[in-house]
């Protein structure tokens, strides 16, 4: 498949069509992604052997889209964020990776202001949130607190871990050591 076909396949699976970039469209994409694409670790196990041989632990975008659209799979935060980044980029969004310590990949989308987008945290995050504004969301399982204080962003899941979000955009190549280490089990 070519890029246009891959984008259309991804959008069709999400139940939408291409629109001009906007916060409304971004939120529509996030909600559909969260509802339709699974967070799972089976694909990490599947991709590990190839990754140990090649150093590339992530599937091609064509493989990723095929897995979500025909096999009901998704991935971890890394795979889901990479796939969503690819989609948003191809739709014209200004999107970057961000790292959350320890061990989490999420996205920054710049529109009228920068937004925090996280489709790989298995949290009740069904929309984009202004990157530098605190917020809290809850569901029957947990409370997710995003606290901005003195240029530092602390994210707490209750129950669950506390992490620190680094808002500077990163490149996946700078995360190679961390990615390799996360597959050393």
Please describe what each predicted stretch is.
Residues 1-72:
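Secondary-structure boundary elements
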Residues 2-5, 9, 103-185:
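His-Asp-centered catalytic microenvironments across diverse enzyme cores
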Residues 18-43, 79-100, 117-141:
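Solvent-exposed, charged interface segments at domain starts and junctions
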Residues 45, 49-110:
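Active-site neighborhood of thiol-dependent amide/isopeptide-bond enzymes
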């Amino acid at each position: 498949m070519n890029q246009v076909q891959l984008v259309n396949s991804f959008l069709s699976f999400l139940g939408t069509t291409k629109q001009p970039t906007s916060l409304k469209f971004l939120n529509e994409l996030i909600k559909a992604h969260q509802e339709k694409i699974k967070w799972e670790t089976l694909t990490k196990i599947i991709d590990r052997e190839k990754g140990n041989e090649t150093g590339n632990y992530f599937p091609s975008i064509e493989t990723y889209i095929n897995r979500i659209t025909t096999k009901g799979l998704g991935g971890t935060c890394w795979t889901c964020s990479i796939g969503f980044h690819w989609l948003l980029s191809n739709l014209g969004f200004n999107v970057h990776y961000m790292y959350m310590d320890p061990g989490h990949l999420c996205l920054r989308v710049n529109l009228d202001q920068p937004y925090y987008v996280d489709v790989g945290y298995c949290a009740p995050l069904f929309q984009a949130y202004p990157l530098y504004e605190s917020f809290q969301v809850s569901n029957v399982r947990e409370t997710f607190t995003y606290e901005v204080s003195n240029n530092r962003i602390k994210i707490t899941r209750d129950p669950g871990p506390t992490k620190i979000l680094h808002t500077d955009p990163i490149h996946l190549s700078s995360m190679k050591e961390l990615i390799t280490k996360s597959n050393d089990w």
